[in-house]
């Protein structure tokens, strides 16, 4: 366990772009200890004035689609233009063992080496999907440390992909250059939340196929109902380093557009509201879980013996919990 | 994409003549056993002989009685103790831990009975206890079998080391084993089960032949026991390391040989394999079993065209020699005859090693530069060469020698053996090639002459004397 | 009644074997095996499919070549070793290069100071090559060079050095490994990405086919896969599939199959499972002939698989090294019974360091005894016909064939490797094997059974690589002063141009640069500027180690400890597994990573070839509790103290450093002194190491 210096030094360090302090700040945030969480809140408080300063982008897609490769090329492109960028990636923890393997830096070796880049892989832990207040808070710390833009990388399965849109300004969905069957396999939902789609690995034999795939996705997107505009579908290849600057230009124009129409601010405000509610739910849940309930076993038996329904049992439990709060 | 392997479609079977046509030389080979072998055997009439079902063996350590605990900790599964002096067995003998094998000049009925007492005192059933109390020569088979009746102890050893150390070839060892067995069976009351008999066999490093020899023994033993209408048809084998090529001054190299010997012993089907007091040798057995996975398959040589052929050839030759011994009236009567045969083999072997015709790595060629002051192994044919090298060390004088004329490989070997260096500048000895050999001269003008190809140890000895007289 | 034996013949019986199936997966179904149904029983030696040997008379006319692989830090020392080995009975030379050379760096490059001269000879220019072969007539001596990544400059130096000493390319005999596909799969000493690498491979095959008819331009290697954990059938299949890919590359360039196929050679590892390993070699020959036949060769030699074998380094233990003599002996026996053409036997201290003169001698003597004292050189394929060997040959052939078909269905080895399939398969096997060893299911003498109480007294050969570094640097600056720099630059520019177009044979062009005294680093960099340097990306596997360990007590304890730690501190224990320096062997590191994840750690895997700065930065950025450095090649002595200093400098000496791998006992004090908290040698049970680490962390939490 790191010998964490006091919160003041940490905050100062983060503001002066000290990599080690930023890293330890993120550790505090990720910690499951309630004492650490309190400290983390203190830290965030100190830094609040220096946040909300960066563009937040999520890069998501199924395993193997090439997120890290694309992020590396994109990151290098950004650093060439003088940006300091942070990448927060989330790797799934095993529900059985609790452990995880995070190999992202092996997939972005050049970026990991760059002076102006901060890359932090995190395990998803117990939280389903993993993208929660921790990610949001970590992002805020990175902003305070002067990184802009911030890229969140997640695997696009389970609830994580839904969660991530509550935290970023734009979601970039990466897909492989196979149209047809794969298209059916992509969950409806993920297509709904994407702001920009990029076909990856469009090199060599795949060049022609990617054009076709792009068109299929465009078509599928056209059938969405709840978006004001239809996202673009781009074609990229990390191997050939093609399409990368187009991705960044598209993001920038999305940003300009959204700022101009006010959507940008609206979205952020909505996100904050959602985040407050989410945090409240989470507090409630942890409070609930922390106690023991006599009625649980009784009700369980009743349901087993077909004497009661699950819903009735839940009502009973909730009553007991509310009573205990008085 | 499913492309079936279909070997025969792509490659038809090959006829003998196809292969023969590619060979221009005669590649057949002979060993000291005098049998002619081909380099290569193919599928012919069925020669699948599965000769034994046991596939694992007992790891045995030969120890002094003070080393029992360490040996057991090192995983010895049985212990062998040499009793050459009259001994009282300690009550701490680990009869409850593993089989014990006692052998030696001083094994007697006292030892036998005290062993049984110890077994009983530990609450064990003496009829179940496994081990050996091998009575020394001269043995009365009836007597040692009677005393052992009701136990599982082996009391009569057929020791092939006796013939091996005299210089026997594999065929001679096989024949003597058969002959000894026959002599014993002839002396037993009819119908007596020879289940207190075992063979002690020294295993060499000619792997294929050693495996074949063990199997050949099993064939012949089975035949003899059946002929005597014995109720059992096989006997246990205790394999020990052959010391014939033991290079005492190159112990690490000798471990290679020991490994090869154990491999042959395992594959050939020994029931017990004995390691000497060296912990390393025990470990070799563990490695071969656990990592090498030897011993999983019983009689792995079954069906091998080459090894089956060798098995049959050795068995036939051994049988023929055995029949000769029998026709002379049995081993006891034919002893001097067979021993003179063996002596000839010994001389032949010794001569080829001492002249350098046959290479023994670390013994007469590829010698180590430095060595410990070890005692040459008495039973090793390398011993004379080792002694010479030790002599170099004891006079602490590695001198220089120069050669006028060609230095043949044999001469080079001689020089290496003596620990001398070739150096023109400070040579104490000059060797000159002559029409039929060499002359060696020291700076006192003393000289000796020797032939090319003479026994290296003898010549080395003379050369050393020449050098020593230079020193004085 | 004494029977009359003169009239009694030997009584024989022939019964079916009863083979005990315990302990070996492959032997499990032996019982039902009908030997007579085997397709291959009537094949022979010297005729396709060469089951029993690639030549008709095999050892009966000429024994295998004793070829001991060796590299001492400098060309001078290597040369001295070769000369003495030749005098002591060795008949072929095998050159081991150091890691910077493999990866295309000159010895004075800033990234490589810890690795220069360790594990092999540093070759920076043609001058080093001249020294390497001083007094050795390249017209008479067969030279085998293990080089893949920087194969172009090395071949160029070799050819030009030979020419300058009067030996023409046509006369040169030997082998260059030049097997880049397996680098991408397991060994990681590649430089450029797959496509340009394959072009280089093709250029070399073509050039050698046209100019060096006695030289083997590629040695398709299974050894490294074996060491990475591939079982026999997999090693066979993937090696031969790689070979097939090279054949196709050459055919695509318009070469006739018979012009190069007879010169393709193979290199297998030999492990401890005696019968399986020997059968593997026989199966290899059948399979290769079967793979080449469809190309319709007119010369049957095109279908004959010739191989070099090396006894497995992985099977050796650092504990009780004397035991290794027996291991190497058994493995050598296996290779010889399997009819290999040449053989390297490991020295008993090969697991610890470069072999010393004494241990090299024993290693060589193993082969000499096999040649001189066992009569094995009289027999051709002596185990032919044996029930168990023919069963295994049959089974391995078919099993490997199905793996090959799988590769073919993906589109060949290049595509398969890009997909990551072979590497993943191999890693799974490695994790399973480690778990079996850790549980004691698979017994390794001296490691998990029969451990010795005393530590070994072996004198180790130490390389003081600072001296090597200094000498090489001096030599390099001298070279650069005495050559014509404009001509060098011209040659390098020409090389760059030809690399970016597809119109010239790169070896042809490299020869010019070599002649002008361009260095290895300069040639490699010129190519890198066009091709780029490749960074491999591999998905790690999980769940395999823990599944195999099942309910092993040690595992459960480790898992509960990591849960306890998580509860106490709010985070799971987090470890960075890093490889410092140029050593590309990552089997050990990857097995440990997957095992630790299964034990409840959050594991960060670092990329290969990291400097101490890189590793420190990663550790700090990810805020790990522990950094685990995996070291196999000796660079640890310089690089780990550097790492500790950097942690100190950056205020993070609270990050604990542990070291795993091949660390000689003599280095322990140095490492502990620099602040390392634990050293885990080979044979450490992973779950036990995990427990130790967590306990140390827990301690620190309660008493900071």
Where are these regions (language model features)?
Chain C
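Short glycine/threonine-rich loop-to-helix capping motif typified by GTGT followed
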Residues: 154-156, 229-237, 271-283, 311-325, ...
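Flexible, glycine-rich loop/tail regions that form catalytic "lids" or insertion modules at the edges
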Residues: 6-38, 44, 48, 99, ...
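Flexible glycine/proline-rich, aromatic-decorated loop/lid segments
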Residues: 259-260, 298-310, 318-351, 355-380, ...
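Short beta-strand/loop segments at the ligand-binding rim of alpha/beta enzyme cores
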Residues: 64, 303-307, 571-574, 650-659
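Conserved, mostly hydrophobic/aromatic
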Residues: 61, 89, 125, 166, ...
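Cofactor-cradling patches in redox/metallo enzymes
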Residues: 589-699
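Short beta-alpha connecting loops at secondary-structure transitions
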Residues: 114-118, 182-192, 225-229, 268-273, ...
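Catalytic alpha/beta active-site cores
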Residues: 1-271, 295-298, 303-308, 336, ...
């Amino acid at each position: 366990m790191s010998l964490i210096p006091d919160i003041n030094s940490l905050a100062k360090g983060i503001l002066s772009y000290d990599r080690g302090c930023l890293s330890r700040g993120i550790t505090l945030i990720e910690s499951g200890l309630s004492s650490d969480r309190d400290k983390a809140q203190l830290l965030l408080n100190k830094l609040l004035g220096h946040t909300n300063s960066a563009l937040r982008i999520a890069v998501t897609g199924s395993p193997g689609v090439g997120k890290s490769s694309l992020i590396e090329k994109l990151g290098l492109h950004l650093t060439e233009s003088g940006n300091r960028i942070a990448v927060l990636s989330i790797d799934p923890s095993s529900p059985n063992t609790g452990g995880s393997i995070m190999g992202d830096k092996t997939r972005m070796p050049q970026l990991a080496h760059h002076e102006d880049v901060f890359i932090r892989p995190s395990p998803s832990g117990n939280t389903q999907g993993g993208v929660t207040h921790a990610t949001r808070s970590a992002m805020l710390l990175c902003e305070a440390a002067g990184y802009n833009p911030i890229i969140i990388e997640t695997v696009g399965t389970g609830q994580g992909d839904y969660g991530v849109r509550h935290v970023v300004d734009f979601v970039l969905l990466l897909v492989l250059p196979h149209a047809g069957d794969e298209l059916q396999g992509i969950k409806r939902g993920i297509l709904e939340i994407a702001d920009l789609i990029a076909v990856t690995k469009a090199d060599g034999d795949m060049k022609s196929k990617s054009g076709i795939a792009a068109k299929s996705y465009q078509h599928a997107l056209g059938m969405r109902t709840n978006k004001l505009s239809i996202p673009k579908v781009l074609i990229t290849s990390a191997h050939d380093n093609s399409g990368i600057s187009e991705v960044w230009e598209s993001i920038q124009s999305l940003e300009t557009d959204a700022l101009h129409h006010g959507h940008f601010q609206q979205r952020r405000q909505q996100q904050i509201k959602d985040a407050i509610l989410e945090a409240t739910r989470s507090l409630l849940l942890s409070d609930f879980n922390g106690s023991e309930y006599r009625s649980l076993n009784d009700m369980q038996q009743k349901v087993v013996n077909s004497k009661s329904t699950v819903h009735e049992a839940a009502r009973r439990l909730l009553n007991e919990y509310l009573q205990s709060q008085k | 994409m499913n492309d079936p392997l279909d070997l025969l479609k792509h490659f038809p079977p090959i006829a003998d003549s196809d292969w023969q046509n590619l060979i221009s030389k005669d590649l057949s080979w002979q060993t000291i056993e005098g049998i002619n072998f081909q380099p290569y055997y193919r599928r012919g009439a069925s020669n699948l002989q599965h000769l034994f079902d046991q596939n694992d063996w007992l790891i045995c350590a030969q120890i002094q009685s003070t080393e029992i605990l360490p040996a057991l900790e090192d995983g010895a599964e049985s212990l062998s103790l040499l009793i050459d002096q009259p001994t009282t067995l300690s009550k701490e003998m680990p009869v409850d831990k593993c089989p014990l094998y006692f052998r030696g000049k001083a094994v007697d009925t006292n030892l036998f009975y005290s062993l049984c007492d110890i077994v009983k005192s530990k609450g064990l059933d003496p009829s179940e206890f496994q081990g050996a109390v091998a009575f020394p020569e001269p043995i009365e088979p009836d007597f040692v079998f009677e005393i052992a009746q009701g136990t599982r102890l082996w009391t009569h050893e057929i020791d092939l080391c006796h013939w091996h150390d005299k210089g026997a070839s594999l065929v001679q060892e096989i024949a003597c084993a058969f002959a000894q067995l026959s002599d014993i069976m002839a002396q037993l009351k009819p119908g007596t089960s020879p289940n207190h008999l075992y063979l002690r066999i020294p295993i060499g490093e000619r792997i294929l032949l050693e495996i074949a020899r063990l199997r050949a023994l099993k064939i012949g033993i089975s035949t003899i026991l059946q002929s005597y209408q014995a109720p059992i048809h096989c006997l246990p084998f205790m394999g020990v390391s052959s010391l014939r090529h033991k290079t005492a001054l190159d112990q690490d190299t000798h471990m290679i040989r020991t490994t090869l010997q154990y491999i042959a012993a395992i594959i050939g089907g020994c029931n017990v394999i004995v390691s000497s007091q060296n912990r390393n040798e025990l470990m070799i057995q563990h490695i071969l079993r656990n990592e090498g996975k030897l011993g999983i398959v019983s009689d792995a040589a079954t069906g091998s065209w080459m090894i089956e052929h060798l098995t049959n050839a050795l068995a036939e030759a051994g049988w023929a020699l055995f029949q000769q011994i029998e026709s002379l009236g049995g081993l006891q009567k034919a002893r001097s005859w067979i021993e003179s045969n063996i002596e000839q083999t010994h001389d032949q072997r010794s001569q080829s090693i001492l002249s350098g015709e046959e290479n023994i790595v670390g013994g007469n060629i590829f010698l180590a530069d430095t060595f410990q002051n070890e005692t040459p192994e008495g039973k090793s044919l390398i011993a004379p060469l080792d002694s010479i090298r030790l002599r170099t060390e004891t006079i602490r004088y590695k001198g220089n020698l120069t050669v006028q004329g060609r230095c043949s490989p044999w001469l080079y070997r001689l020089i290496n053996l003596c620990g001398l260096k070739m150096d023109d500048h400070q040579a104490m000895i000059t060797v000159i090639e002559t029409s039929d050999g060499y002359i060696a001269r020291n700076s006192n003008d003393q000289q000796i002459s020797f032939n090319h190809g003479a026994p290296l140890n003898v010549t080395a000895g003379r050369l050393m004397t020449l050098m020593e007289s230079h020193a004085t | 009644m004494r029977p009359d034996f003169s009239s009694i013949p030997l009584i024989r019986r022939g019964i079916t074997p009863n083979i005990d199936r315990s302990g070996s997966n492959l032997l499990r179904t032996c019982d039902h095996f009908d030997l007579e149904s085997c397709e291959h029983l009537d094949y022979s030696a010297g005729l396709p499919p060469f089951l029993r040997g690639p030549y008709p008379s095999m050892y009966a006319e000429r024994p295998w070549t004793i070829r001991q692989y060796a590299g001492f830090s400098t060309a001078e020392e290597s040369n001295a070793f070769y000369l003495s080995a030749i005098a002591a009975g060795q008949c072929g030379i095998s050159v081991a290069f150091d890691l910077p050379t493999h990866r295309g760096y000159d010895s004075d490059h800033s990234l490589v100071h810890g690795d220069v001269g360790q594990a092999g000879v540093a070759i920076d220019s043609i001058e080093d090559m001249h020294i390497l072969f001083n007094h050795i007539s390249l017209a008479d001596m067969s030279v085998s060079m293990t080089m893949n990544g920087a194969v172009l400059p090395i071949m160029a130096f070799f050819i030009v050095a030979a020419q300058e000493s009067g030996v023409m390319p046509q006369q040169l005999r030997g082998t260059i490994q030049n097997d880049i596909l397996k680098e991408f799969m397991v060994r990681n000493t590649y430089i450029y990405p797959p496509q340009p690498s394959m072009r280089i491979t093709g250029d070399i095959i073509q050039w050698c086919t046209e100019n060096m008819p006695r030289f083997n331009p590629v040695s398709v290697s299974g050894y490294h896969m074996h060491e990475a954990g591939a079982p026999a059938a997999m090693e066979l299949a993937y090696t031969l599939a790689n070979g097939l890919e090279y054949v196709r590359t050459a055919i695509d360039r318009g070469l006739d199959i018979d012009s190069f196929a007879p010169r393709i050679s193979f290199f297998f590892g030999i492990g401890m499972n005696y019968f399986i390993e020997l059968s593997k070699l026989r199966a290899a020959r059948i399979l290769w002939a079967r793979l080449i036949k469809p190309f319709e060769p007119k010369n049957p030699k095109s279908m004959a698989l010739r191989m070099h074998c090396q006894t497995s380094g992985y099977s050796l233990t650092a504990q009780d090294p004397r035991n290794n003599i027996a291991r190497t002996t058994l493995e050598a026996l296996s290779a010889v019974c399997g009819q290999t053409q040449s053989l390297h036997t490991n020295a008993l201290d090969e697991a610890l360091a470069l072999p010393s003169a004494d241990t090299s001698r024993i290693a060589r003597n193993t082969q000499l005894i096999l040649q001189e004292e066992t009569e094995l050189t009289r027999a051709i394929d002596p185990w032919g016909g044996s029930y168990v060997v023919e069963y295994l040959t049959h089974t391995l052939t078919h099993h490997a064939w199905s793996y090959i078909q799988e590769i073919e269905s993906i589109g060949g080895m290049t595509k398969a490797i890009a997909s990551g399939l072979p590497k993943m398969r191999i890693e799974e096997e490695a994790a399973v094997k480690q778990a079996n060893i850790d549980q004691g299911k698979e017994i390794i003498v001296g490691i998990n059974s029969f451990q010795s109480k005393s530590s070994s007294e072996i004198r180790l050969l130490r390389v003081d690589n600072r001296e090597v570094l200094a000498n090489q640097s001096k030599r390099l600056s001298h070279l650069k002063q005495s050559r014509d720099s404009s001509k060098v630059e011209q040659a390098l520019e020409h090389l760059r141009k030809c690399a970016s177009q597809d119109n010239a044979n790169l070896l042809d062009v490299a020869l010019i640069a070599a002649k002008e005294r361009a260095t290895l680093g300069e040639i490699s960099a010129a190519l890198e500027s066009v091709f780029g340097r490749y960074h491999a990306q591999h998905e790690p596997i999980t769940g395999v180690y823990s599944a195999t360990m099942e309910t092993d007590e040690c595992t459960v304890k480790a898992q509960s400890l990591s849960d306890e730690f998580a509860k106490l501190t709010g985070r799971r224990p987090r470890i960075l597994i890093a490889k410092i320096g140029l050593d590309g062997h990552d089997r050990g590191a990857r097995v440990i990573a997957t095992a630790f994840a299964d034990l409840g750690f959050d594991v960060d895997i670092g990329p290969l070839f990291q400097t101490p700065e890189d590793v420190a930065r990663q550790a700090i950025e990810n805020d790990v509790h522990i950094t685990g450095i995996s070291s196999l090649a000796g660079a640890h002595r310089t690089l780990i103290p550097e790492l500790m200093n950097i942690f100190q400098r950056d205020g993070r000496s609270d990050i604990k450093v542990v070291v795993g791998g091949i660390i000689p006992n003599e280095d322990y004090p140095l490492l502990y002194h620099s602040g390392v908290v634990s050293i885990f040698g080979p044979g450490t049970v992973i779950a036990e190491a995990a427990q130790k680490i967590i306990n140390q962390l827990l301690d620190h939490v309660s008493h900071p």
